[in-house]
């Protein structure tokens, strides 16, 4: 019988997940289908119960349900619980189990472009919202020891740091201070929506004095190169946009559902083509 997978969210028509996962199923000769389900906030509980009754094998969760979904699951992975959000659900032995592959997917994507272990790096995170939280906790879980957080509201950065139970040396900074100290970091990660289409001329941090070999990663992928990435490239930095995070988090979910490892480069090239790259 064909295995059913999917993604729930609102809106959902723009999602590239069905294209990416269905191509992977076809490539691996798997009898499975991935479908996008439009689910409004007021019917989330009913939708989850319906998917469980249908025997769905697993599904992704996107905006605006990543936090609310946690009330309707049988179990939640400890890291996802710490992050406070779920983006992947596995249906196993009659139970819906929630995970967060956003942060771990990002860590894997970042490691793929770093020639050295991330654990040895000094990292600066820009932003203290949901995406930053997932990345911060996942980097800490992976053993990274130095992660500073810069945010427009410094208190929010302090709250994020205080919420993490792992042993990490972290300082909360203003964006102004981070701009002055950017040369002290090996990796800078941009997690806000600043610079996203259509406000492409905006940047949270003016790149001006990076040290040699710095990696600058932006979780935005529209445009492919945000202002911060363009400035970093001019400084000779290694740059990475949000496509890698999207692909790696999807590949990790695929692996958790099926036990099979998809072809990540194939997934990435497909997503780039679909985005017009």
UniProtKB/Swiss-Prot annotation:
<protein>
    <recommendedName>
        <fullName>Shikimate dehydrogenase (NADP(+))</fullName>
        <ecNumber>1.1.1.25</ecNumber>
    </recommendedName>
</protein>
<dbReference type="InterPro" id="IPR011342">
    <property type="entry name" value="Shikimate_DH"/>
</dbReference>
<feature type="binding site">
    <location>
        <position position="62"/>
    </location>
    <ligand>
        <name>shikimate</name>
    </ligand>
</feature>
<feature type="binding site">
    <location>
        <position position="102"/>
    </location>
    <ligand>
        <name>shikimate</name>
    </ligand>
</feature>
<dbReference type="InterPro" id="IPR036291">
    <property type="entry name" value="NAD(P)-bd_dom_sf"/>
</dbReference>
<dbReference type="GO" id="GO:0009423">
    <property type="term" value="P:chorismate biosynthetic process"/>
</dbReference>
<feature type="binding site">
    <location>
        <position position="221"/>
    </location>
    <ligand>
        <name>shikimate</name>
    </ligand>
</feature>
<keyword id="KW-0057">Aromatic amino acid biosynthesis</keyword>
<dbReference type="Pfam" id="PF01488">
    <property type="entry name" value="Shikimate_DH"/>
</dbReference>
<dbReference type="Pfam" id="PF18317">
    <property type="entry name" value="SDH_C"/>
</dbReference>
<dbReference type="InterPro" id="IPR022893">
    <property type="entry name" value="Shikimate_DH_fam"/>
</dbReference>
<keyword id="KW-0521">NADP</keyword>
<dbReference type="InterPro" id="IPR041121">
    <property type="entry name" value="SDH_C"/>
</dbReference>
<dbReference type="GO" id="GO:0005829">
    <property type="term" value="C:cytosol"/>
</dbReference>
<dbReference type="InterPro" id="IPR046346">
    <property type="entry name" value="Aminoacid_DH-like_N_sf"/>
</dbReference>
<feature type="binding site">
    <location>
        <position position="242"/>
    </location>
    <ligand>
        <name>NADP(+)</name>
    </ligand>
</feature>
<dbReference type="GO" id="GO:0004764">
    <property type="term" value="F:shikimate 3-dehydrogenase (NADP+) activity"/>
</dbReference>
<comment type="function">
    <text>Involved in the biosynthesis of the chorismate, which leads to the biosynthesis of aromatic amino acids. Catalyzes the reversible NADPH linked reduction of 3-dehydroshikimate (DHSA) to yield shikimate (SA).</text>
</comment>
<feature type="active site" description="Proton acceptor">
    <location>
        <position position="66"/>
    </location>
</feature>
<dbReference type="InterPro" id="IPR006151">
    <property type="entry name" value="Shikm_DH/Glu-tRNA_Rdtase"/>
</dbReference>
<comment type="similarity">
    <text>Belongs to the shikimate dehydrogenase family.</text>
</comment>
<comment type="pathway">
    <text>Metabolic intermediate biosynthesis; chorismate biosynthesis; chorismate from D-erythrose 4-phosphate and phosphoenolpyruvate: step 4/7.</text>
</comment>
<feature type="binding site">
    <location>
        <position position="87"/>
    </location>
    <ligand>
        <name>shikimate</name>
    </ligand>
</feature>
<dbReference type="GO" id="GO:0008652">
    <property type="term" value="P:amino acid biosynthetic process"/>
</dbReference>
<dbReference type="GO" id="GO:0009073">
    <property type="term" value="P:aromatic amino acid family biosynthetic process"/>
</dbReference>
<keyword id="KW-0560">Oxidoreductase</keyword>
<feature type="binding site">
    <location>
        <begin position="127"/>
        <end position="131"/>
    </location>
    <ligand>
        <name>NADP(+)</name>
    </ligand>
</feature>
<feature type="binding site">
    <location>
        <position position="219"/>
    </location>
    <ligand>
        <name>NADP(+)</name>
    </ligand>
</feature>
<comment type="subunit">
    <text>Homodimer.</text>
</comment>
<dbReference type="InterPro" id="IPR013708">
    <property type="entry name" value="Shikimate_DH-bd_N"/>
</dbReference>
<dbReference type="GO" id="GO:0050661">
    <property type="term" value="F:NADP binding"/>
</dbReference>
<keyword id="KW-0028">Amino-acid biosynthesis</keyword>
<dbReference type="GO" id="GO:0019632">
    <property type="term" value="P:shikimate metabolic process"/>
</dbReference>
<feature type="binding site">
    <location>
        <begin position="15"/>
        <end position="17"/>
    </location>
    <ligand>
        <name>shikimate</name>
    </ligand>
</feature>
<feature type="binding site">
    <location>
        <begin position="151"/>
        <end position="156"/>
    </location>
    <ligand>
        <name>NADP(+)</name>
    </ligand>
</feature>
<dbReference type="Pfam" id="PF08501">
    <property type="entry name" value="Shikimate_dh_N"/>
</dbReference>
């Amino acid at each position: 019988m064909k295995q059913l997978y999917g993604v729930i969210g609102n809106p959902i028509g723009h999602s590239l997940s069905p294209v990416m996962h269905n191509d992977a199923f076809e490539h691996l000769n798997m009898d499975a289908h991935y479908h996008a389900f439009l689910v409004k906030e007021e019917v989330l509980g009913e939708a989850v119960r319906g998917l469980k009754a249908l025997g769905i094998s697993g599904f992704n969760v996107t905006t605006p349900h990543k936090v609310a979904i946690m009330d309707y699951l049988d179990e939640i992975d400890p890291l996802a619980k710490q992050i406070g959000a779920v983006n992947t659900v596995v249906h196993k032995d009659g139970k819906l189990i929630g995970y967060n592959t956003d942060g771990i997917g990002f860590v894997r994507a970042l490691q793929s472009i770093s020639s050295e272990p991330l654990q040895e790096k000094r990292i600066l995170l820009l932003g203290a919202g949901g995406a930053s939280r997932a990345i911060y906790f996942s980097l800490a879980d992976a053993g990274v020891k130095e992660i500073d957080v810069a945010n427009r509201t410094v208190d929010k950065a302090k709250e994020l740091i205080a919420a993490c139970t792992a042993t990490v040396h972290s300082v909360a900074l203003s964006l102004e201070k981070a701009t002055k100290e950017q040369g002290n970091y090996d990796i800078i990660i941009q997690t806000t929506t600043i610079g996203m289409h259509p406000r492409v001329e905006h940047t949270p941090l003016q790149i001006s004095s990076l040290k040699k070999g710095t990696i600058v990663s932006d979780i935005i992928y529209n445009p492919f190169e945000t202002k911060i990435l363009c400035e970093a490239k001019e400084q000779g930095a290694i740059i990475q946009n949000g496509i890698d995070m999207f692909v790696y988090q999807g590949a990790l979910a695929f692996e958790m559902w099926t036990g099979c490892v998809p072809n990540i480069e194939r997934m990435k090239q497909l997503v780039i083509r679909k985005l017009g790259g």
